[in-house]
Regions:
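Generic detector of short alpha-helix boundary/capping microenvironments
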Residues: 1, 8-15, 40-41
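Alpha-helix N-cap/helix-initiation motif
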Residues: 2, 16-17, 180-181
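Conserved N-terminal/central alpha/beta ligand/cofactor-binding core
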Residues: 3, 39-174, 178
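Short secondary-structure boundary/capping segments within folded domains
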Residues: 3-4, 26
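Core beta-strand elements of the Rossmann-like FAD/NAD(P) dinucleotide-binding domain
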Residues: 5-9, 177-182
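N-terminal Rossmann-like FAD-binding beta1-loop-alpha1 element of flavoenzymes
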Residues: 10-36
């Protein structure tokens, strides 16, 4: 394989949605090299661009963790991991603050307060953004931090280290070109 088709990095992230971008930025904060690969245009493909709300758990707003976790468990028909749900909620306010710092605007009331809407299914509250607000802000922040973004690459296979099953890379194919990338 030609060397120009081979890439090396400390962290490879497959998927350019909200989770992929947060993982990329947080890895760069630790000083490691990061490549983010996405089958479309990272930040504007998949489901993340359509998100117009964000659940930010904050005890200072009167939120109670048990109620939030119970709502997600019930609505998810108890197939989700409860500990993972708790962790996501406990980290959510910090991620909200990151989004604000990176330029994502959230809707406010006429009085200028943050607009929070409580779910009809339980105590969880959502914060709302204009349509397609997350993706461009996440992409801009990732690039600013030095994340290498590779758009329109379809990952075909994960590369495993001999014998122990550790993932050491991936093989991908550019969507609009011939050839493979490793």
């Amino acid at each position: 394989m030609p060397p120009e088709n081979m890439f090396e990095t400390d962290v490879l992230i497959i998927g350019g949605g909200m989770a992929g971008f947060f993982a990329a930025v947080k890895a760069r904060e630790r000083g490691v090299g990061v490549i983010l690969v996405n089958k479309g245009y990272a930040g504007q493909s998949g489901q993340s661009p359509w998100a117009d709300s964000f659940a930010a758990f904050n005890p200072e707003w009167g939120h109670e963790l048990e109620g939030w976790v119970n709502q997600v468990n019930r609505v998810g028909e108890y197939v989700n991991n409860r500990e993972w749900t708790e962790l996501c909620f406990l980290e959510s306010y910090a991620r909200y603050r990151d989004l604000v710092a990176w330029g994502v605007e959230f809707h406010r009331t006429e009085d200028g307060d943050l607009f929070r809407s409580t779910s009809s299914l339980g105590p969880c509250q959502a914060l709302f953004t204009p349509p397609r607000a997350h993706g461009p802000a996440l992409r801009k922040e990732a690039l600013k931090r030095g994340v290498r973004i590779m758009d329109r690459i379809m990952i075909l296979e994960l590369v495993r280290q001999d014998g122990d099953g550790v993932i050491t890379g991936a093989v991908g194919m550019p969507v609009a070109e011939d050839g493979f990338l490793v």
